[in-house]
């Protein structure tokens, strides 16, 4: 682990000071420890919601000689988590180095292939099924790897599991901070994504079990869910992009910029083309828009286990461990 020594040094200082113990879940969790091996650093880094408040409150932050910068340190450790626990690991490293370029090129190439192929909406079903299987396996492997290193061997009480799930779904530790809109945009993005997934699932049910082919009526469940989810994703990702570009450079890890922008760009493009497809589904533009949309969705799927999406899974796991410790 590249930042193990620096992490242990900074947390020893923070453990002696404890001025920030009321800011979030990280500092009470830190106070329950006297040593900080790599597994504990992975846990604390993913428990952090990156609000940055501790940096502005810290009397030992740069230019002090102690140079305590917890937000930046934990951001760097989180990136190590993404790489260390990803499967396959080589793809995670490649995506980290040029995330935006990889994401855009992948979407463009897949869209071009789909345009060149026979224009049958259902021709790509097998391809998407294979991609979905890969995503489920890769994310599951990553979650298991993370829990083995940064989790706990204690049993998981039902109350602790429910509390951890609630903290994750409500973004409890994004409720404070100088930019409250960050929590709102995260909610719009996360729940927009879930609504789009629900729309796809309902559409699959209608097609395979009810034998109803797309396009579906405007007031049908797939269209309503997809429209609401797409709008949420569009606004949420645009807001997160603005906040990302405005974020104080002193507390962010520049090495993650490509990965972050790649993920945001794919989410935004997926929602934008999905809404455009709805509006143009009875025009001659529909096949081209459909190809771009399917290309964006497939590119998003293929990069989910190797990019910023995994931060939600590891953070939920860290919140679960925190809930177990509190009980």
Where do the model's predicted regions map?
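Short acidic alpha-helical/loop segments enriched in Asp/Glu that coordinate divalent cations
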Residues: 207-212, 248-252
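Juxtamembrane loop-transmembrane helix junctions in multi-pass integral membrane proteins
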Residues: 3-6, 90-93, 119-122, 177-183, ...
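Helix-loop boundary elements of multi-pass alpha-helical membrane proteins
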Residues: 173-175, 246-250
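Secondary-structure capping and boundary motifs in well-ordered enzyme cores
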Residues: 16, 40-51, 227-230, 257-264
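Iron-sulfur-cluster electron-transfer modules
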Residues: 32, 36-202, 206-209
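Ferredoxin-type iron-sulfur electron-transfer modules and their immediate structural context
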Residues: 1-48, 320, 326-327
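A short local structural element in Rossmann-fold oxidoreductases
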Residues: 25, 59, 314
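Hydrophobic cores of alpha-helical transmembrane segments in multi-pass integral membrane proteins
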Residues: 101-115, 125-143, 159, 163, ...
